[in-house]
Amino acid sequence: MRLPLIDSHCHLDAPEFDADREQVMAEAVQAGVVGIVIPAYVASRWSALLDFCAAPRPQGPVCWPALGLHPVHLSAHQDDDLTLLEDLLRKHPEVVAVGEIGLDRFLPELAEPSAWARQVRLFEAQLMLARERDLPVILHARRCHAQILASLKRVGHRSGGILHAFSGSVEEARQYAAHGLHLGLGGPLTWPQSARLRTVATSLPLSALVIETDAPDLVSYPHSSQHADGRPRQPGERVRNSPAWLPDVLDTFAALRPEPREVLAAAFRENTVRALRLPPSSLVLEP
């Protein structure tokens, strides 16, 4: 049965969707996706994202923008971007969060001392902007959970948000939850070998969890062998993820947890609304 869902993290503004974005959204609506949170990742795309999310879509889905400087795109960021971000947050109350922001030690070039110092500086500056405007954050963290938590405490951000694509331990998940953050789980959870993530999915209270696709990245296991147009994936090819495949994540949770699928869907929707303070109408939208 199709159930109303919110994709709490989808880069629908990415160039990978330029050729068929409207079709992707139509397919998402058909799958039950009533809302999509779109976190920007570089300043050059902020204006276009705001315009895209403001466009009326009578058939859905509702699209909510978040603005931020993603750590993986460190080389693209300018110091003046922080001034622009502050200005846009002041002028655009429809922005639901500061994100995608965070820290990344997975890529070797980002772990170099100078790059790491710049990551931390930009991250904490954006946390400060979020704190000043009492906005939630959408966080990226790879191999740096202790540092992320330390920055949150140092800056004093307590306005909640989502740690997206969570890949840490149960204990780390509980630390984020204690700080008022929700944990976003998506495609990686659906893969059979994801034992650690599945432990997180079953150990945390349902109230701490949200679901996401992170499209075009992190494709779910059921859709990993062929492209959206039905072509089989060839060796070395990457399958573009889609918000229409968000039900794969719901189905995995339903197989792992005792709650009925309908209860899970409603909880994930309500948790996303609460985490990002989305308009209450998000709770009653029909797919």
Locations of the language-model features?
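Mid-domain alpha/beta scaffold segments of enzyme catalytic cores
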Residues: 1-287
